[in-house]
Every structure is written in structure tokens, then in C-alpha cells.
From Swiss-Prot:
This is Serine/threonine-protein kinase SBK1. It is found in: Cytoplasm. Gene3D superfamilies: Transferase(Phosphotransferase) domain 1. ATP binds at residues 59-67, 82. It catalyses: L-seryl-[protein] + ATP = O-phospho-L-seryl-[protein] + ADP + H(+); L-threonyl-[protein] + ATP = O-phospho-L-threonyl-[protein] + ADP + H(+). The keyword ATP-binding applies. GO terms for cellular component: cytoplasm.
Length: 417
């Protein structure tokens, strides 16, 4: 069976909106990756691509590929075309990502894909919705964080996205603000994206190359030879770190390992061996601290499900200290761990990607959001009634408020001390 038939069909049969076919959103019907690997992609020359798709602008570019905002000339439908370099990925991994994304597209909190799947001489290509407001990382004011009402709207929708994934025994494995796409800058509508590292629960994978602050401690400690079995707990941990970041504009640590003094201090607090709170956690209320204790439990089996955050969102999460930007030099006396690591925070962290060692898999290139598919409009998800009042008008970081695609260079988020 060939991907790229001329008539539009639901994505579960994997056609491609090639010449003459109007793009339609995927039907959200799962197709086993094993079945997809038997398919052959339709090959399009560069002239075929420009014949049917008008380039609006480039949205992002990275090691693994690029993302272009295009308009389908037949209908004017805008979409994000993701070009993945063949030299950086295997066909089965590309098809796995498309299949998984489509199988989850029935959730209003997960990015949708169009029935556009093809290859060029150098790239594999698929199309997804376009998110005009970029990603969550882009709007977090460093060392300040987002307004709590905005955070609660975002967390509510991400919790529903993760609960939907986990109920289907799928683990995202790369939860971070860069993979949360926005349709407005007040987070009234957000969607989870980038499923290049997603695997089924219980699947054994090799250790990822490198770590980022969202990586769970059991993943950091996994041996390169043995790897580890995928579990929803890694998403729950990353979700907890993400919530800390959006509330504070800082990372809690650089890596969840014993070599990181900030993480070690957190471990001592979690185990009841530290009198008082670590300085960077003092801004949170008691309900928020209980939430973090559950999401960031050191043992994976003790972490609550992602949807457990909902019961904490009815409470205030931060105290008045939340409104004060953190400064490295302002550390309470006697609140440091011994040694030089506690005296200076690491440098600013920029956008990071993870890959699986020796597996040939890769994360998605910079992802960009979805648009209203044709002819069926995408329904706007509405957070739970009464959860969060409307956000105050305007941006909170002093920059001009203008919708745009994802930015490749990151706004720095620093360690809070």
C-alpha cells in the first residue's frame, strides 16, 4: 500500500495529501506501527511541494529537521509541515511518531495531524496543526514565572492530555515547556506535542543521551547497557518539574542526580532529613508542596497519577514571595549545603533535546502548532468551570504581544536559589 493516494482519506489508512487532494484532519483511529512499517511513502520532488503548498515562513530549524508554515493552495488551509532529515532518523521511527500522534488526536489537548505524509530526497515529511502563539517556554518570564491563573489553565489541560495518553498505556518521555504548543498567550488553549520519544508502558529502552532538569532520577541512574522499562512515572516527574518552572521562571536543579547540590537538598527534604524547606521551595503554599511531594516522589511507584494535580488547583499555589524575582546572591544564612556547588547556580539553560543512545531514534524537530483543519473546525477545549478566572490582559514579560510560531533560541530559565 502506498502513502500518497490522490483522494483524501482518514489518516488511519495513511494517505498523503499529494497532488489534488485537500488535507483533512486525522480520524484519530490508531494504526499499529508494525502495519505502518510495511507502507511505502509517496515521493514528492521539491517542485511538487511548491506546486501544492505555499510557503508562508519558516517556523523552526534544528539538527533533526525544520518546520515550515505553509498554506495548501487548493483551500488556503494553513498547517505546519515537519521535515525530518533522513540522515537523523529511521523510517520506522518517523512512522511511529505519525501513528502515535494520530492515535491520540481525538483528545482536544493533543496536537492533531493532517493526512499529509510523504518523503522528499532528503526528508520525511508530515503535517500537523499550526499553533500561532508558539510554545510554553517562549512566554515564561525568567525568574518571575507566569501568573498563577495562567499556570492553572495550562496545568489543567496538560493533566488531561497526560491522563488520556497514560490511559492508553503510552508514555510521552519528553514532557517540557518546549513541547507544549499554544493557541493564545494566556494558555486558554494549549496542546501537548512531539511524540518522537513516546513508547508503550513496559517497553524496554536504552538510556537517553544526556539529561535535562525534567529527567526523572531513575532515568538518570539507568545503566547504559541495561536501560530501563518505560513507565508513566517519568511523565509525572517531568510534569512536576514543568509546573515548578512555569510558576517560578527557574529550574529547581540542573539534573536529578547526586552530583547536583540543589537536587540533593530536595532529596534530603523529601526524606525528612532537612530542617525547614530548601530556599527555592519556600514560595509555595502547603497544598502546592503536597502536590510536589506526590509528583516528585523519589520512588516512581509512589508518584500519583498526572490527574491528581486537579485536586490541588482549587488552592492557592504560591505565597507573596512568589512575586519577588529570585536572585543568586540572596540566600538565607545557614541554608546552604556544604561545598562550593551550593554557592553558585549553574548557567542559563537553553532548549535541549534528548536521544536514545544507539537506537537511531530522535526527537521531533522544533514543533509548531496546529490550525483549524478543513473542513472540520478543531473544537476549543474549555478548562474545568471555575478553575481559573480570565488572565489579565497583555503580556507579563514586557515584550510586545504578537502571535508567532516557535522560536528556535530559548529564553533563559535559570536555577532558583
Amino acid at each position: 500500500m502506498s502513502v500518497g493516494c490522490p483522494e483524501p482519506e482518514p489518516l488511519h489508512s495513511l494517505p498523503c495529501c499529494g497532488p489534488g487532494a485537500a488535507p483533512v484532519p486525522g480520524a484519530g483511529v490508531p494504526l499499529l506501527t508494525e502495519d505502518m512499517q510495511a507502507l511505502t511513502l509517496r515521493t514528492l520532488a521539491a517542485s511538487d511541494v511548491t506546486k501544492h503548498y505555499e510557503l508562508v515562513r519558516e517556523l523552526g530549524k534544528g539538527t533533526y529537521g525544520k518546520v515550515d508554515l505553509v498554506a495548501y493552495k487548493g483551500t488556503g488551509t494553513k498547517m505546519a509541515l515537519k521535515f525530518v532529515n533522513k540522515s537523523k532518523t529511521k523510517l520506522k521511527n518517523f512512522l511511529r511518531e505519525v501513528s502515535i500522534t494520530n492515535s491520540l488526536s481525538s483528545s482536544p489537548f493533543i496536537i492533531k495531524v493532517f493526512d499529509v505524509v510523504f518523503e522528499t530526497e532528503e526528508c520525511y515529511v508530515f503535517a500537523q496543526e499550526y499553533a500561532p502563539a508558539g510554545d510554553l517556554f517562549d512566554i515564561i518570564p525568567p525568574q518571575v514565572g507566569l501568573p498563577e491563573d495562567t499556570v492553572k489553565r495550562c496545568v489543567q489541560q496538560l493533566g488531561l492530555a497526560l491522563d488520556f495518553m497514560h490511559s492508553r498505556q503510552l508514555v510521552h518521555r519528553d514532557i517540557k515547556p518546549e513541547n507544549v504548543l499554544l493557541f493564545d498567550r494566556e494558555c486558554r488553549r494549549v496542546k501537548l506535542a512531539d511524540f518522537g520519544m513516546t513508547r508503550r508502558v513496559g517497553c524496554r529502552v536504552k538510556r537517553v543521551s544526556g539529561t535535562i532538569p525534567y529527567t526523572a532520577p531513575e532515568v538518570c541512574q539507568a545503566g547504559r547497557a541495561d536501560g530501563f522499562a518505560v513507565d508513566t512515572g517519568v511523565d509525572v516527574w517531568a510534569f512536576g518539574v514543568l509546573i515548578f518552572c512555569v510558576l517560578t521562571g527557574n529550574f529547581p536543579w540542573e539534573a536529578a542526580s547526586g552530583a547536583d547540590a540543589f537536587f540533593e537538598e530536595f532529596v534530603r527534604w523529601q526524606r525528612g532529613r532537612l530542617p525547614g524547606l530548601p530556599s527555592q521551595w519556600r514560595r509555595f503554599t502547603e497544598p502546592a508542596l503536597r502536590m510536589f511531594q506526590r509528583l516528585l516522589a523519589l520512588e516512581p511507584e509512589r508518584r500519583g497519577p498526572a490527574k491528581e494535580v486537579f485536586r490541588f488547583l482549587k488552592h492557592e499555589l504560591t505565597s507573596e514571595l512568589r512575586r519577588r524575582p529570585s536572585h543568586r546572591a540572596r540566600k538565607p544564612p545557614g541554608d546552604r549545603l556544604p561545598g562550593p556547588l551550593r554557592l553558585e547556580a549553574p548557567g542559563p539553560l537553553k532548549r535541549t533535546v534528548l536521544t536514545e543512545s544507539g537506537s537511531g531514534s530522535r526527537p521531533s524537530p522544533p514543533s509548531v502548532g496546529p490550525v483549524v483543519p478543513v473542513p472540520v473546525p478543531v473544537p476549543v477545549p474549555v478548562p474545568e468551570a471555575g478553575l481559573a478566572p480570565p488572565a489579565p490582559p497583555g503580556r507579563t514579560d514586557g515584550r510586545a504581544d504578537k502571535s508567532k510560531g516557535q522560536v528556535v533560541l530559548a529564553t533563559a530559565i535559570e536555577i532558583c536559589v
